[in-house]
Amino acid sequence: LMAQMQYERFDRIPDTGPERVEYIARKLLALDYYITMEELRQILYVSRSTLNQDMRQVRRLLELYGLKVVHASHKGIRLQGTETALRRCMAELFFRDDGKWEKAPGTGHGEERISQIQQILKSRADALRVSYPEAVVRELALQIYIAAQRCRFRKEVEFDSSLQVSRR
């Protein structure tokens, strides 16, 4: 995918099936090029049949977001879907219920950056004398962070030109 979101190696190799499924899904979200099944197999230290079983689960998971794992002969696999779907999936797979940012391979300072964005949002809201629930500020900061990361690499959301903004 992108140089910075070219994920650093994860801290540890996943052991269980669900951990591998999440790892593979996150890996595919991070890449904007093909990766071979053999490369994944070597990264995860699993057999071909184990990887095939995990990939079935990965496909099911990503389909929930409107994303598809596509295969190209002699190239490997990669994700296909709209930029909006990719961003939504990233937000849900990298942001945990406990409020912690899961390190995406290559993001490095995600949690720190999101906290900085939150502080900016809070200070602007305070200046305008507006208050928002903490969860809303956190979600907005996360979406801004993802958008900034994706835009740096020319991954922009396309809008339908037929949509009109109503002015009241």
Predicted stretch roles:
Residues 1-168:
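A cross-family "folded-core" feature that marks the main globular domain of proteins
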